[in-house]
């Protein structure tokens, strides 16, 4: 289950949030994970077709049953590079679970970004869970080194991961056992 850090900006607090979520995923038994940073992907910005696909990311998504996206809210939306990266791996997303972690300096914690990203993920074939994590006022949740300042925040991440892993297992069962257009 890759954790996709969805912004390339310098000084990004989203990186700390992504690392925290990733570390919590690593604690889960039987779950393979890796942190994928859009800033380091070799994806050309002038091509959104098959030629823009990063083979390593495609292979990661082929193996994955779920995807965690961690992204900040920029002007009520999501980062453009995140959208570009998502657009390059269309077949690999079909019938896989997705969970979104929003990050913002304000009180909404990326909620408006999440609202805008959900229909995009649905169009790509991902199935989003209903539970999100919102890092509201991120500077009061994480210090300048990325350490969590409020341990009571961890149960939110745990509930999010519980829901995401349940959905991932359910969708994996469906992909493996229920023919498309068929019945169980």
What are these regions (language model features)?
Residues 94-95:
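His-Asp phosphorelay/catalytic-motif detector in bacterial-type signaling
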Residues 98-139, 149-156:
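Short, glycine-/small-residue-rich phosphate/pyrophosphate-handling segment
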Residues 71-76, 101-111, 138-144, 173-177:
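Repeat-unit-sized solenoid/scaffold elements
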Residues 34-45, 91, 124-144:
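Mobile beta-alpha loop/short-helix "lid" or hinge segments that flank ligand
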Residues 1-91, 148-166, 171-184:
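N-terminal beta1-alpha1-beta2 submodule of the flavodoxin-like/Rossmannoid cofactor-binding fold
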């Amino acid at each position: 289950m890759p954790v996709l850090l969805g912004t390339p900006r310098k000084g990004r607090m989203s990186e700390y949030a992504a690392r925290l979520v990733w570390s919590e995923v690593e604690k889960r038994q039987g779950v393979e994970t890796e942190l994928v940073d859009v800033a380091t992907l070799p994806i050309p910005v002038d091509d959104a077709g098959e030629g823009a696909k990063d083979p390593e990311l495609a292979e990661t998504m082929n193996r994955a049953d779920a995807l965690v996206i961690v992204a900040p809210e920029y002007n009520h939306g999501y980062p453009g590079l995140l959208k570009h990266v998502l657009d390059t791996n269309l077949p690999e997303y079909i019938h896989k679970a997705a969970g979104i972690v929003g990050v913002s300096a304000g009180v909404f914690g990326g909620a408006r970004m999440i609202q805008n990203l959900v229909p995009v993920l649905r169009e790509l074939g991902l199935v989003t869970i209903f539970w999100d994590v919102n890092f509201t006022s991120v500077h009061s949740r994480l210090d300048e080194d990325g350490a969590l300042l409020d341990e009571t925040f961890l149960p939110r991440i745990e509930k999010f991961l519980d829901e995401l892993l349940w959905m991932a297992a359910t969708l994996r069962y469906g992909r493996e056992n229920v023919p498309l257009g068929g019945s169980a």
